[in-house]
């Protein structure tokens, strides 16, 4: 057994050593695109056009001037690795030695980890292999990650812009690294922290003349994903007597006006082509606004989750929905922590749901608190549910859209959410088509 294990480790180190010694990135990229046809995790065309993308902050010239040198070690180098069991390419991961969260990508797509090894001897965590190429755990906050899709690149742009915003009322620059607690949706929830959800949108239905704020009825939620588009649930546009016609951004109190809020009319509603109002499937839509949003500290687009699976224990929902079943709606934006329910449990709970003839599908997931007491509720539909990662103190990644549930916060009745990753290609084709 010891001999076999030694042989396995030797082969892994040999593979990693070979790939890190390979200077021909173009040849590797060609192999990358061809072989991704046989994997669950796919690389879009935009990855071919961006040889190096940055996460979080600008990369200075010193960090990028010699990328090929980070692809190889010295001839006598011994690569320190650890093997993670059961992780596939594209999976969420945590490094064994420091607990940093990341995702599993090919070794040559995470140059910063390679440089860390060469300079500091930092351990490399191997998730799996593809065609003898090591797939390693690459921290989400690393600056050197090759080939990102457009929504990931836009996330970086939006947050870099937010850090550079000059707040004229205070004369300082917004760092984006700390969220300021707010004052005291969601059943069992708490008020949101200021700056944590600048992408939150409230959908409105104009009543009468619509000349006054009282003439707008606020219902569903949504998430700003670009300068012109808001993401929401398809049923929010089809379940009433008329569709929503207004979006409010930058508001934390719906019953109060503020200098930060922006009210913008809806120009076009784009339902997912497979959505049918008679079923709960493909419950997702994009709202095109009549004008571009003005970005500020309080208003900027969301970051969209880039991985096929969540593999995180909890998510955070936000909205202005009811604070109890059939109770009054909340005027204050609130948030609640929810447990991600195992997919098999989710399928079992909703196996007899009339509007789910095929049961829970891959494009859906459940979240809640099975003992009861915490949940999204009426009025939260269409609002985003988020992953909060320690590396990004003030950035919430949208992982899903609130779709439906049995009751609010009842035991063994988690809410059902549209899984964002399943529709990421569709979102990008519409919201970022000018790019």
Swiss-Prot record:
Cellular component terms (Gene Ontology): extracellular region; extracellular space
Keywords: Developmental protein, Disulfide bond, Glycoprotein, Hydrolase, Protease, Secreted, Serine protease, Signal, Zymogen
Stretches assigned to the Peptidase S1 domain: 186-432
CDD domains noted in UniProt: Tryp_SPc
Domain Clip: 92-138
PTM notes: Proteolytically activated by gd. May also be cleaved by another protease.
Domain of life: Eukaryota
Signal peptide start-end: 1-27
Record EC number: 3.4.21.-
GO terms under biological process: dorsal/ventral axis specification; innate immune response; proteolysis; Toll receptor ligand protein activation cascade; zymogen activation
Active site: 235, 283, 381
Outcome following mutation: residue 184 to L: Blocks cleavage by gd
SUPFAM superfamilies: Trypsin-like serine proteases
Task performed by this protein: Component of the extracellular signaling pathway that establishes the dorsal-ventral pathway of the embryo. A protease cascade involving ndl, gd, snk and ea results in activation of the spz Toll receptor ligand; acts downstream of ndl and gd. Activation of ea requires both activation of the ndl-gd-snk protease cascade and sulfation of a vitelline membrane component by pip. Localized activation of the Toll receptor in the ventral region of the embryo defines cell identities along the dorsal-ventral continuum.
Similarity annotation: Belongs to the peptidase S1 family. CLIP subfamily.
Cross-referenced PANTHER family: EG:BACR7A4.3 PROTEIN-RELATED (PTHR24260:SF147), PTHR24260
Protein name: Serine protease snk
Gene for this chain: snk
């Amino acid at each position: 057994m010891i001999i076999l294990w030694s042989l396995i480790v030797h082969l892994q180190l040999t593979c990693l050593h070979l790939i890190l010694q390979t200077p021909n990135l173009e040849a590797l990229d060609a192999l990358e695109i061809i072989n991704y046809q046989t994997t669950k995790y796919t690389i879009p065309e935009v990855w071919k056009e961006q040889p190096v993308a940055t996460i979080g902050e600008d990369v200075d010239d010193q960090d990028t001037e010699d990328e090929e040198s980070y692809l190889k070690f010295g001839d006598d180098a011994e690569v320190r690795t650890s093997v993670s069991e059961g992780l596939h390419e594209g999976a969420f991961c945590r490094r064994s030695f420091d607990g940093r969260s990341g995702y599993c990508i090919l070794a040559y797509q995470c140059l910063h980890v390679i440089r860390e090894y060469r300079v500091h001897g930092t351990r490399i965590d191997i998730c799996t292999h593809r065609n003898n190429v090591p797939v390693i755990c690459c921290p989400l906050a690393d600056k050197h990650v090759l080939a990102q899709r457009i929504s990931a690149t836009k996330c970086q742009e939006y947050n870099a812009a937010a850090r550079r915003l000059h707040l004229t009322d205070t004369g300082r620059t917004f760092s984006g690294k700390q969220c300021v607690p707010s004052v005291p949706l969601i059943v069992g929830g708490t008020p949101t922290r200021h700056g944590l959800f600048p992408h939150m949108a409230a959908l409105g239905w104009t009543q009468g003349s619509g000349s006054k704020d009282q003439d707008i009825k606020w219902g569903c939620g949504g998430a700003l994903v670009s300068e012109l588009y808001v993401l929401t649930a398809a049923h929010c546009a089809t379940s009433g007597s008329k569709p929503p016609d207004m979006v409010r951004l930058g508001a934390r109190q719906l019953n109060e006006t503020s200098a930060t809020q922006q009210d913008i009319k809806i120009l076009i509603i784009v339902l997912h082509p497979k959505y049918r109002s008679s079923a709960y499937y493909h419950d997702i839509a994009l709202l095109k606004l009549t004008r571009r949003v003005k970005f500020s500290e309080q208003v900027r687009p969301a970051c969209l989750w880039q991985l096929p699976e969540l593999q995180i224990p909890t998510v955070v929902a936000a909205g202005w929905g009811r604070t109890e079943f059939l109770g009054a709606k909340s005027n204050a934006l609130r948030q609640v922590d929810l447990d991600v329910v195992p997919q098999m449990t989710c399928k079992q709970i909703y196996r007899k749901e009339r509007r789910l003839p095929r049961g829970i599908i891959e494009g859906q997931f459940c979240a809640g608190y099975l003992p009861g007491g915490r949940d999204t509720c009426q009025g939260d539909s269409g609002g985003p549910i988020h992953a909060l990662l320690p590396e990004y103190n003030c950035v919430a990644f949208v992982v899903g859209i609130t779709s439906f549930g049995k009751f609010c916060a009842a035991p063994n009745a988690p809410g059902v959410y549209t899984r964002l990753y399943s529709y990421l290609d569709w979102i990008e084709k519409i919201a970022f088509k000018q790019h």
